[in-house]
UniProtKB/Swiss-Prot annotation:
This is Triosephosphate isomerase. Involved in the gluconeogenesis. Catalyzes stereospecifically the conversion of dihydroxyacetone phosphate (DHAP) to D-glyceraldehyde-3-phosphate (G3P). CDD domains: TIM (cd00311). It is found in: Cytoplasm. It comes from Shewanella halifaxensis (strain HAW-EB4). The lineage of its organism: Bacteria, Pseudomonadati, Pseudomonadota, Gammaproteobacteria, Alteromonadales. The keyword Acetylation does not apply.
């Protein structure tokens, strides 16, 4: 059985400030216990430099704990007349190691198709970033028992563009759309069922990838439900939204992941 290091990735979305970043670090930087879990902070792009500086300033306090920086999005293009966009190389230069790809809010609000998501996945890896690929079904799709079909389609487009071995350097985040930002989480059993499906599907093409890829759960994760979610055999941590803005609660999630 593969030893997959748990991950807790905090997606600030369009929230936060440089001051908030400082307050978060003051509260949790010295309290992280060890390197048994990886913590990723994904602030708005304008604050990447602030977070990078805080990581450098708190390196001694972090004492070897694995705290990385990630971005919330990137362009599928390397450069050009794409006003407001940020390329993979720019994110790499900013100190990012990870980037969220295909978040449900990007797909829904900005019309990002699975083809665009696959292109962004490729752009991330081209520039040495590890994509955190988000997949998930809507409420109506779940009610129609199409969860596996929807997720398979989203995975297959990325595989067709990039190949299965591209997932050797990737993270998958299952985020049921009906649970994102709603306060309604999937049950541990529901999450495990979908995570197991994702792992099995990748294993059919590459047993190594299937066994070793980390699959996060994203959808109203809180300190009260995290232990049961993270205890599932195919759940390797969480992609956290609003709770990542609360230092006390985010630290609690990190601590739970470290003991999972």
């Amino acid at each position: 059985m593969a030893l997959r290091r748990p991950m807790v990735a905090g997606n600030w979305k369009m929230n936060g400030s440089a001051q908030l970043a400082q307050e978060l670090f003051k509260k949790f930087a010295t309290k992280l216990q060890d390197d048994s879990a990886e913590v990723v902070l994904c602030p708005p792009s304008i604050y990447l430099e602030s977070v990078r500086q805080l990581l450098d300033e708190n390196k001694e306090a972090l004492n070897g704990c694995l705290v990385r920086m990630g971005a919330q999005n990137l362009s599928q293009h390397d450069f050009g007349a794409y006003t407001g966009e940020i390329s993979g190389q720019m994110l790499k230069d900013s100190g990012c190691r990870y980037v969220i790809i295909g978040h449900s809010e990007r797909r829904r609000m900005y019309g990002e198709t699975s083809v665009i998501v696959a292109e962004k996945f490729a752009a991330a890896q081209k520039h040495g970033l590890t994509p955190i690929l988000c997949v998930g079904e809507s409420g109506p799709a779940r009610e129609a028992r199409r969860t596996f079909e929807v997720i398979a389609e989203e995975l297959d487009v990325v595989i067709e563009k990039n190949g299965t071995m591209a997932f050797d350097n990737a993270i998958i985040a299952y985020e049921p759309l009906w649970a994102v930002g709603t306060g309604k989480s999937a049950t541990p059993e529901q999450a495990q069922e979908v995570h197991a499906f994702i792992r099995k599907r990748l294993s059919e093409v590459s047993p190594f990838i299937g066994e070793n890829i980390r699959i996060l759960y994203g959808g109203s994760v809180t300190p009260s439900n995290a232990a049961d979610l993270f205890a599932q055999p195919d759940v390797d941590g969480g992609l956290i939204g609003g709770v990542s803005l609360n230092a006390t609660e985010f630290l609690s999630l990190c601590t739970i992941a470290m003991s999972a």
